[in-house]
Curated annotation (Swiss-Prot):
Protein name: Uncharacterized protein RP821
GO cellular component: cytosol
Molecular functions per Gene Ontology: 3-octaprenyl-4-hydroxybenzoate carboxy-lyase activity
One Pfam family hit: UbiD_C
Superkingdom per UniProt: Bacteria
Sequence intervals crossing the membrane: none
SUPFAM superfamilies given in the database record: FMN-binding split barrel (SSF50475), UbiD C-terminal domain-like (SSF143968)
Protein family per UniProt: Belongs to the UbiD family.
Biological process, per Gene Ontology: ubiquinone biosynthetic process
Amino acid sequence: MSFRDLPEFLKFLEKNGQLKRISTTVKTDLEITEISRRVLAQGGPALLFENVIKADGSKSTIPVVTNLYASIKRICIGLNLKSPAELRELGALLAFLKQPQIPESFKETLSILPLAKRIFSMSPKTIAKGACHEVVIVKPNINILPIQKCWPEDISPLITWGIVVTKGPTKDRVDHYNLGIYRMQVVSENKLLMRWLKLRGGAEHHKRWKTKKKELFPAAVVIGANPVITLAAVTPIPENVSEYNFAGLLGNKKIELVQCKTIDLKVPAHSEIVLEGYVSLAEYLPEGPFGDHTGYYNDVEEFPIFTVTAITMKKKPIYLSTYTGKPPDEPAILGEALNEIFIPILHQQFPEIVDFWFPPEGCSYRVVVVSIKKSYPGHAKRIMLGIWSYLRQFMYNKFIIVVDDDIDVRNWQEVIWAIATRSDPKRDTSFIDNSPIDYLDFASPKSGLGSKMGIDATDKMYPETNRKWGKKIEMSQEVIDKIDSMWDGLNI
């Protein structure tokens, strides 16, 4: 089932026991975070806070929803998928879009045509009026929004689920519409800080704009959108596909866009709230500290100022929010879903990969365990180097553990057993120095530059070892089958 907008999605979730209304008065300052954190830890529903007190002590006229994507089930519902198993099918589609294979026959060519036609037919549709323009405020005050302060030492309230819409300075494909989710620190009534990492789409547009244009860089921030738009913004979509097109493909319906009121950008017409404005090319301010997905407060660093020129919204909007902290948190759960999407993409490039796992406690991407069908000496190291260099999302990975296909990568007991029995610390550990690292990683020797470690925990073959390799203990299948047939009668 696809949804037109966020309220329609919430209505469906509530009907199916996946949303809980909170009528008790709560504060945006810390209280929403603590309630959301406890419910998420219990595997609970999305939360709709109907009576919210803002940072200035006034009551918000806008309700707040949190934990919306804090379960794989809700993510699948939002992506218009029937089950988590279909996440890999979605990954297979992305793998095809990223690197289409040449058809081997006329029949195969015919089978691909409907998919290609469907992709290109999902270009967004511009309409004259949108629900997000029911209220237009041209003298904007950000403080009308119930923006969360997530952690005690956060320097200010923080917009956490804003979809930032940008375009580059040219008509080249690389400058087409980009959707990205970046946190934004509140600085004043009409100013925010745009915290985007250097290699993200919005930051790349901003960088190219500096070299091509003299005028300010327009950007729009969408808060509360159709779930396929939100999830398209966090999915590893190939650069040759627009997030708007991909969202239309997910929802099986063209995304309706509307022209912004004060800037030359188009945004989803059924958005709850939109902040229009310009990102400065020269003015930067210190951002942070804020609690982050690592479970620590991040360092202070300068980011460009986003000046809001208008706030547009529905008559009765809903404010979508989240928090980030030590896993489990909402980004970690989204990471679990994205993990399933990554597997077919990786398998297309490395067919020997059997399974791939970003443990949530590894802070989204810092630790990965991968199993392979090993077929030659040095195979594990080739996989390490391949993963580190293949996708931009893996650039900041610090630790890769490679195991054989008899090991369940999602079971730490098996992974640790493989490391303990199949690896030698000197022979089977590889290091790479002076490699790109997430600048938020304070454990690295230099900001943005650190090392990577790979552990080969696979069975060894000549010439990796000259010793006789151990034989794995396994019960005979005949005995297993016999005991299976006897089991109920044993009354154990």
